[in-house]
Amino acid sequence: MTKVMIVDDDRNTVKLLQTLLELDGYDVAVAPRGADVLPVAEQALPDIFLMDYHLADMDGVDVIRELRAHATFAKTPIIMTSGLDVEVEALEAGANVFIVKPFEPGDLPGLFTSLLAAGN
């Protein structure tokens, strides 16, 4: 079962995404703050990260840099989401894909499959 880690501080967004992904057969872990990402990820060992740019305690780009510096997650696919114009910054930090909010949650499984098949 593919493990997805949602990194987002918006409870409603997390609840929606978690419910939809679990219905699609994904195992989901959640980190609501940037500071929670590494401890939760080290326990859950996700196959892919779905991360919001704006978090309560830090921005997602800083979290991406931390993940890329960690041997276990250096190559784990990261999808960053935001309504802000931060695509270049996110990709330069190491995100594999940037999605503009709002996005269609139903498109995520296909994107996950593509990223995991590509070995990114």
Q: Which sequence ranges carry the predicted segments?
A:
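Short hydrophobic/Thr-rich beta-strand motif most characteristic of the beta2 strand and flanking loop
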Residues: 25-32, 40
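The feature encodes the CheY-like receiver
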Residues: 14, 56
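C-terminal output helix
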Residues: 103-114
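Active-site residues of response regulator receiver
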Residues: 52
